[in-house]
Regions:
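Non-heme di-metal
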Residues: 1-321
């Protein structure tokens, strides 16, 4: 990837909340739909700010000055998305049936997640952001937009999705780097962490795993059952994660080995039905998404591609789903 070209694109495609015309009126909604839509956008604001915190950590760790500038634009993107989500919540809150607050599980997860960021290795932090962005871009945002079915949401989501596509391109690029011999060489040159740091890292990581499942269920899986009841887009997002997680070099790091092991256990013809629930709990997702979601042909094709090619194919899948 040409990082300077990507940075130029990031700067060129910036926009503001005021670029959207907020003077329109929303379409008529039932009470149930209005309450659901306002809550969805309220939670979306919290999710976007969580993504922004991850990009702040990635910017802090990045050594390449161009990459740091790219992450700076991503941080601005996520805050802008959060503000737009808040304004969309207000826009559709016509009847003010009740008071809306960010989902309790999202609120409780945030401080533990931010604390864990300080101890997560580079590849782990990147894998969390990549997974979250794939769910957002391929599944959640587009399904919310279809559910709302209103011009105001469509205009906002078009701009947000354009930003998220840039994010995913960089997420995959960084995943490729963390799967490379160059990253292993960089790790070997770093001084080993102290025993106290390793203990804190494991403690925060185990705490993150413990809280990830209820967070993911409340913020991603339950809303998707409402806005995408067939689960088609969610399966597509997790298929892209599985294809990426099976690429050469992913198992270079302990977290990559754990990911691959959980997938292999879940896909095993004998152990899978017995242990898939346990593997899903560790991964923080629903068991159905630990099943094998790709064909042999799709895996063979993916293994012939580099990570930038996988990103392009993941983004192209949005149009097909």
């Amino acid at each position: 990837m040409d990082l300077q070209r990507m940075l130029d694109r990031c700067r060129r495609e910036q926009w503001t909340v005021d670029d959207l015309d907020w003077s329109a009126r929303p379409r008529s909604l039932s009470r149930a739909d209005e309450e659901a839509i306002v809550q969805l956008f309220t939670d979306m604001a919290g999710i976007e700010r969580l993504a922004g915190a991850l990009f702040e950590e990635q910017q802090r760790r990045a050594q390449d000055p161009v990459l740091r500038e790219i992450f700076a634009t991503f941080i601005a993107d996520e805050e802008r998305h959060a503000v737009v989500a808040e304004q969309l919540a207000a826009f559709y809150n016509v009847h003010r049936y009740r008071t809306y607050q960010i989902n309790e599980h999202l609120r409780k997860f945030r401080p533990h997640f931010l604390r864990a960021l300080r101890y997560l290795s580079d590849d782990v932090a990147n894998m969390y952001i990549t997974g979250g962005e794939l769910i957002l871009d391929i599944a959640l945002l587009r399904s919310i937009n279809d559910y709302v079915a209103d011009e105001m949401s469509e205009r906002a989501m078009a701009l947000i999705n354009r930003d998220e596509s840039r994010h995913i391109a960089i997420d995959y690029h960084m995943t490729g780097y963390y799967a490379s011999p160059a990253y292993l060489a960089e790790l070997a040159q770093r001084p080993p962490p102290s025993l106290l740091t390793r203990v804190k890292a494991w403690y925060t990581f185990l705490g993150l795993i413990y809280r990830a499942a209820p967070f993911s269920r409340a913020v991603f899986f339950q809303p998707m059952r409402l806005v995408d009841p067939t689960g088609r887009r969610m399966r597509e997002a997790f298929k892209r994660m599985q294809l990426m997680s099976s690429q050469q070099g992913i198992d270079n790091t302990p977290f990559g080995k754990l990911q691959l092991f959980l997938l292999q256990v879940s896909h095993h013809p004998v152990a899978g039905p017995l242990l898939r629930g346990v593997a899903a709990r560790i991964a923080g997702i629903e068991p159905e998404f630990m099943q094998r979601l790709y064909s042999d042909e799709e895996m063979a094709r993916a293994r012939r591609m580099d990570f930038d090619g996988l990103a392009r194919e993941a983004l192209a899948s949005k149009l097909a789903s």
